[in-house]
Amino acid sequence: MDFTSLETTTFEEVVIALGSNVGNRMNNFKEALRLMKDYGISVTRHSCLYETEPVHVTDQPRFLNAAIRGVTKLKPHELLNVLKKIEKEMGREENGLRYGPRPLDLDILFYGKHKIISDKLIIPHERIWERPFVLAPLVDLLGTEDIDNDKIVAYWHSLSMHSGGIFQAWERLGGESLLGKDGIIQRVIPIGDHLWDFSKKTYVMGILNLTPDSFSDGGKFQSVDTAVSRVRSMISEGVDIIDIGAQSTRPMASRISSQEEIDRLIPVLKVVRGMAEMKGKLISVDTFNSEVALEAIRNGADILNDVSGGSLDENMHKVVADSDVPYMIMHMRGDPCTMQNKENLEYNEICKDVATELYERVREAELSGIPAWRIMIDPGIGFSKGIDHNLDIVMELPKIREEMAKKSIGLSHAPILIGPSRKRFLGDICGRPEASERDAATVACVTAGILKGANIIRVHNVRDNVDAARLCDAMMTKRFKNVD
């Protein structure tokens, strides 16, 4: 049946797959998303980002693949024409080699609850069910609860011809077991000029506080020389990421002006960015101030680490969306002065509540234009949490992912950071009132977190925690090999 005359006077929900293996693949995706918006396609969800081997024509570069959900008033064939126009604007040759190299490939996977068969267009896309590089990002756009609560998504599931819907179709191809296996498909995050796979190892983030009032090392590294010396020390100990902060976020910390924070941060950031020893290392900047974030990004920050997730500065999401840096979103209630107030410590189920509130922050960021493939999450150990809350989070990290997956499987795959380093709850448990005496407890805590699925650990003592991370990674690698 030909649906070329399908009338569309209201918005229809669509799913569009993206692929690229020529030129700057991430820029190709970024420009494609911008052009979709210009042509009347509003993106509502992003998948994770995947690097995949080419199929059919194998003598070509690896692809980046992703997918988006969006809404549009464009009719099916109007949408097809728009996507072809975008491909052409991005340099794709109209009569190029089939399955060959291309700067951009845009395919309509679903269009509302419509089946469409014409000479130019078949929806649902006829090869969805046989392609892991299509199904992986497609699954990301769904939630585990959608099939019961969303009629359009339930219809998409029905098209798979499997009782378990799209999820079962993905599992029949191998599902998550395909990731990292023989290089077929990798879930990656773009940082700078490289793609990072946070499932391969635990990344150690070393803390560099440029503040006079941080709870553990305030005042130690305020000069450029002492800060650089500290960075060199952390590099020698095996750090992966340097997290630089110029505004204290300890309980009851006073908020300084944007200019003061910039004046503390930028001189150090510039020097650290230029250090030869930083090759292969990343720089994260810890700030909840959008003006500071903008200057940090301009001066070489690779990651923006925001303890408020944008709740303390309404311009933060726009600053991050306009950049190319990943965004670390942490769970916190209130601000550093109010986060430990009684009303901010009341939870029904800590992991479920944290996941729900984190999801809300993440969705606000995504709808502001920050793709899911640039988002990382932090459950906020020590922020708006009591002792038992912190312990439950560390021991039940999979529960946070599970709760996130109910709303968005893609967002549930975001790298998780934990930051228990030297925090008061460790001292309360171990009888260590001095923060500097809590390193052994920190190692124990991050070890538990890594074994429960943490991807990044944020610590003061780099050497000991690098050892802990390496041992945990070795144990988990051995466990997975034994399972195979």
Curated annotation (Swiss-Prot):
GO terms for molecular function: 2-amino-4-hydroxy-6-hydroxymethyldihydropteridine diphosphokinase activity; ATP binding; dihydropteroate synthase activity; kinase activity; metal ion binding. Pathway: Cofactor biosynthesis; tetrahydrofolate biosynthesis; 2-amino-4-hydroxy-6-hydroxymethyl-7,8-dihydropteridine diphosphate from 7,8-dihydroneopterin triphosphate: step 4/4; Cofactor biosynthesis; tetrahydrofolate biosynthesis; 7,8-dihydrofolate from 2-amino-4-hydroxy-6-hydroxymethyl-7,8-dihydropteridine diphosphate and 4-aminobenzoate: step 1/2. Inhibited by sulfanilamide. InterPro entries: DHP_synth-like, DHP_synth_dom, Dihydropteroate_synth-like_sf, Hppk, Hppk_sf, Pterin-binding_dom. Residues 15-141 are annotated as: HPPK. Expressed exclusively in reproductive tissues. Signal peptide: none annotated. Induction: Up-regulated by slat stress. Up-regulated by oxidative stress. It is found in: Cytoplasm, Cytosol. Disruption phenotype: No visible phenotype. Increased sensitivity to oxidative stress. It holds the Pfam family Pterin_bind. GO terms for biological process: folic acid biosynthetic process; response to oxidative stress; tetrahydrofolate biosynthetic process. (7,8-dihydropterin-6-yl)methyl diphosphate binds at T249, D286, N305, D378, K423, R458, V459, H460. Disulfide bonds: none annotated. Catalyzes the first two consecutive steps of tetrahydrofolate biosynthesis. Plays a role in seed stress response and survival. PANTHER family: FOLATE SYNTHESIS PROTEINS (PTHR20941), FOLIC ACID SYNTHESIS PROTEIN FOL1 (PTHR20941:SF1). This is Folate synthesis bifunctional protein. It comes from Arabidopsis thaliana. The lineage of its organism: Eukaryota, Viridiplantae, Streptophyta, Embryophyta, Tracheophyta.
